Amino acid sequence: MNLPSEDVQTPETANSPRMKRQRRALDVLVIEDESIIAKDIELIVSDLGHRVIGPARTQEEALSLGLKARPAVVVADVKLADGSSGILAVNEMLKSIDAAVIFVTAVPQWLQTGELEPVLVIPKPYTVEEIKAAVSHATSRRAQSMETFVATKDAVSRLTRKQ
């Protein structure tokens, strides 16, 4: 069987805009109060072929966007613009939606509970490769079992209590 050459994926074409569009795009909510960082994360996520929701700058905005859009992945900072909490926003969201969670923060020690957590944490400053790897990992885990989702909710809940 002969396929049209434009439909054949090679290492050279794997990351072409056309091939990225053909992959299943997921909604990714960005919760970040610093506009430069939010834009950077948006560009990285978009480059992976996913749709960006947000950015949300406050806990209230994050909850509103997250509950309305029901994203597959949430990329969140810990401290937000009005002094509110990305951890609390994510914790509240996970009561209603099934989403993979990535925290990008300048204070990763706040997210250490001493236990193995099913939540990805990337310290600032980050590299493009770190964000890409985390989002790719989170989206590949999108078919996660309910057991893993419950573990993620429990982990974020523990972070909330620690805060």
Please place each PLM-identified region on the residue numbering:
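Acidic, metal-coordinating helix/loop segments flanking the phosphotransfer/catalytic sites
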Residues: 42, 55-73, 81
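Conserved acidic carboxylate
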Residues: 32, 105
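Conserved phosphotransfer cores of two-component systems
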Residues: 67-69, 91-99, 114-116
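Non-catalytic signal-transmission and effector/linker regions of two-component phosphorelay proteins
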Residues: 1-27, 127-163
